[in-house]
Each structure stands twice: as structure tokens, then as C-alpha cells.
């Protein structure tokens, strides 16, 4: 994270800095923090699920997250020992339904699934797109449609309007491991065929650094979840804008270990109860996320 970044970085980290270097070092080193905020009443169908999956009741599980996506998962600006966001609340609601608590392990986005596979985390609820490629490393319970936004500097000086030929010659900032990376790379041959320069990629570990790349003039665009892009525009209305929203053929999913199908089924069943109770929709509204992202859950595996 670069210094002097402005509103969004200040929103995420000012409180942590004020806590002192030792406290900040502890946050970075331990990376296991507690959630913030209480959940709505547990749905009535959850009692039967706790009876069906008794091994989960009373447990404390670890959720691996990349806490740099305001609205989804971020450090609480009022208390750097806590996390806040839609994914945090959704995970807590699922945990309440099944009788377990969650703690959090913060990692880079690229390390989310490896952290899960190594046993350092039990679950990943961190705005991660479920793809067949990623399903080789984990099973997914999908719960959200995907719409990406194209973030650009105010006035869109490069005239970028999507993952198309307007991207030719542009510098795109992206998160390492994000599905948008190969989409940008795939434009290279198409641009060459059209007699245009290929787009270039700058890879970063989190959303805030990608946004900073545009603010600093190093990058021309950042393509990511439309709600993340909208949050960036809200933070920097005089410096950034959303050029367009594009449909991406993926869903957001909860990742669980491939060798724990019973746990996967339990999470799926709990998510269904949470949705039936209206909690999922309430959380979308609470965090000012697009309710059109809502989808009924499904399972995605590599098979």
C-alpha cells in the first residue's frame, strides 16, 4: 500500500496507523481478526440443520479473506481489530445458522485458495469468482451474479469502453489471480490483428493499489466487480468514473475444501435458509450493493 493515496486508503487504514506501529504490525503478522457487528435473528430452519450437522456446533472456523474491498470485506475504520462488509455479515449469518463462529485470516487474493488447501483456513468468503479452473482447488457454493465495472480516470481520456478494442494500448491495473487478467491478456492478439498496440498489465495484490495506479497516472483502467468500481468512484468522484458495466460469465462463490463434501452441503443448506429468511437481500441493501446480484445458491465443482 502506497502512502499519500487519498480517501479510500485512509478509510481502510487510518485507524490502524493511529493504533501504533506495534498494533499495526500485529495486525499484519497475525492476520486473524474478529468480526464486527451482530446478525439478524437465526432463521427457524437452522435448528434442524444444527441437528443434522452437530459436529459444526460450537466450533470456531477460519475464513480466509483479502480485506481490501469496501462493501464486501475491509478493516473496520472505527476499530482495526475488526472486519466489516457484506461477506463478513453473510458468513456470520451462515455460521449462526450452523452454530459455528468465524475468525479471519487476511491474505493476498492470490493466496486465498492455497491458504484453504493448506488447512490454514476452513472457508473462503471473500468476493471470489467461482470458475472451473478455481474449482480444481476448491468446491464452490455460488451466491451472486457478476457484473464488472470499467474504472477509468475522470473524463475517460483513453476512451476505454469495455474489454474490447478500446483497451488496445491501454495500461490495465489488475489483481493477481483475478479472472480479469486473462480477459485482458486475450485482447493482445485481437489488438495486433487490428493493427493496434497490445494492452499492458500491471499486477497488484489488492483493489486499493489498483485504484491508486489510476489515481497516480500509472494505469488507465481497472476492471473489477461493479460494486467495487462504484465504491471507488464514490470515494474519488472528482478523479474517477465508471466507463461502463460489462457482464462476466461467472458467479461469486464461497470456497470450501474439496475433501469435505458434508461441510459444503451444510454451508449450502444454511445459505438457502439465510436467503429464505430475507437476510441475504437485507445485507445487499445494508451495504448498498446492487440487489440484482442476488442469485439462488448452487454448487460448482471441477467434475
Predicted regions mapped to residue ranges:
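A ligand-binding cleft/hinge motif common to bilobed small-molecule-binding domains
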Residues: 110-114, 128-136, 185-186, 215-248
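Bilobed "Venus flytrap"/periplasmic-binding protein-like clamshell domains
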Residues: 67-70, 81-96, 128, 149-206, ...
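Ligand-binding clefts/hinges and TM-proximal coupling segments of bilobed small-molecule sensing domains
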Residues: 41-44, 48-51, 179-196, 242, ...
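Extended ligand-binding regions for polar small-molecule ligands
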Residues: 43, 88-97, 156, 169-171, ...
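Short helix-initiation/N-cap motifs at beta->coil->alpha
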Residues: 86, 104-114, 158-159, 198-212, ...
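Acidic, polar ligand-binding/catalytic clefts
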Residues: 101-165
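Periplasmic-binding protein-like
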Residues: 145-152, 230, 234-272, 290-303
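Extracytoplasmic small-molecule ligand-binding "clamshell" domains
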Residues: 41-127, 286
Amino acid at each position: 500500500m502506497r502512502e499519500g493515496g487519498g480517501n479510500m486508503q485512509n478509510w481502510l487504514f487510518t485507524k490502524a496507523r493511529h493504533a501504533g506501529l506495534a498494533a499495526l504490525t500485529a495486525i499484519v503478522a497475525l492476520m486473524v481478526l474478529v468480526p464486527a457487528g451482530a446478525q439478524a435473528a437465526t432463521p427457524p430452519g437452522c435448528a434442524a440443520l444444527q441437528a443434522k450437522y452437530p459436529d459444526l456446533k460450537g466450533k470456531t472456523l477460519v475464513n480466509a479473506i483479502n480485506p481490501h474491498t469496501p462493501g464486501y470485506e475491509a478493516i473496520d475504520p472505527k476499530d482495526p481489530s475488526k472486519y466489516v462488509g457484506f461477506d463478513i455479515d453473510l458468513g456470520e449469518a451462515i455460521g449462526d445458522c450452523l452454530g459455528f463462529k468465524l475468525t479471519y485470516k487476511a491474505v493476498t487474493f492470490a493466496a486465498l485458495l492455497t491458504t484453504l488447501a493448506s488447512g490454514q483456513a476452513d472457508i473462503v468468503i471473500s468476493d471470489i469468482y467461482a470458475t472451473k479452473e478455481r474449482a480444481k482447488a476448491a468446491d464452490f457454493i455460488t451466491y451472486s451474479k457478476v457484473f464488472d465495472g470499467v474504472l477509468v480516470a475522470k473524463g475517460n481520456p483513453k476512451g476505454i469502453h469495455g474489454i474490447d478494442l478500446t483497451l488496445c494500448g491501454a495500461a490495465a491495473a489488475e489483481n493477481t489471480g483475478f479472472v480479469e487478467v486473462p480477459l485482458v491478456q486475450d485482447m493482445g492478439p485481437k489488438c495486433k490483428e487490428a493493427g493496434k498496440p497490445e494492452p499492458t498489465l500491471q499486477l497488484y495484490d489488492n483493489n486499493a493499489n489498483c485504484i491508486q495506479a489510476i489515481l497516480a497516472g500509472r494505469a488507465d483502467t481497472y476492471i473489477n466487480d461493479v460494486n467495487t468500481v462504484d465504491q471507488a468512484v464514490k470515494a474519488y468522484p472528482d478523479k474517477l468514473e465508471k466507463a461502463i458495466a460489462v457482464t462476466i460469465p461467472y458467479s461469486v462463490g464461497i470456497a470450501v475444501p474439496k475433501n469435505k463434501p458434508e461441510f459444503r452441503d451444510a454451508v449450502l443448506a444454511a445459505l438457502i435458509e439465510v436467503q429464505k429468511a430475507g437476510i441475504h437481500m437485507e445485507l445487499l441493501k445494508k451495504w448498498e450493493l446492487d440487489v440484482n446480484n442476488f442469485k439462488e445458491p448452487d454448487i460448482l465443482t471441477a467434475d
